[in-house]
Amino acid sequence: MSLNFVRYQHAHDFATPHEFDAAIQYGYGNWPSANARYLIGKETSIVCSPQLRDALPLRTPQDLLRATLLQHIEVPLAWQDWMEANGLDTSASRFGPGFNLYSLIIRAAVSGFGVGIVPTCLVEDELQAGTLVEPLKDRFDSPLGYYLCAPTARTNLSVYRLVAGWLEHCCNHAEGAAAPAVAEAGAGCIFCAPPHGANGANAVTTAATMAG
């Protein structure tokens, strides 16, 4: 079996003809005419550089009121929702620049320009390397995530079920566990350490054609 991945900037609604078999999309999982299977990405982290954490300093939710908050323009209420959930006055916040890619937010946070609110799966490498830290320690679940989407008719294909099972395994297997046969054949595990450019934007679609 061979897989071909193509990156699109906007989500596909599957109500119109398309040239791919399935897509990995970021959102609420409710796209028209699509069968959506959740993969990863709901776990969310608040991140910044260690230098910014120590300089402000950042230790409590209230401390974020004096930090520049980096925003995703296609998830515009992320910070507001978090602040309201933590009893903070959003009118006192310093909402900073907006970006259309999580990868840009991550790079800005690493460079010390502000604090980002991002899917944890996208910053695992930076957290491990110490270029980003979680100043508040606590993570939380977002209603948004990455989903494998396809027209319902395609989901009955054996090749689709194989790829769906592989992706779900990649997103859930414990560190060091063996990936299934499709990965051993050379496809790799695209979600164990997701490349920022491949799935770092709210509306980005990573579409795949499958040949078996």
Labelled PLM ranges:
Residues 1-4, 87-96:
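A local structural motif
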Residues 1-31, 181-195, 209-212:
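Central regulatory/effector-binding core of bacterial HTH transcription factors
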Residues 31-36, 40, 126-136:
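Ligand-binding "clamshell"
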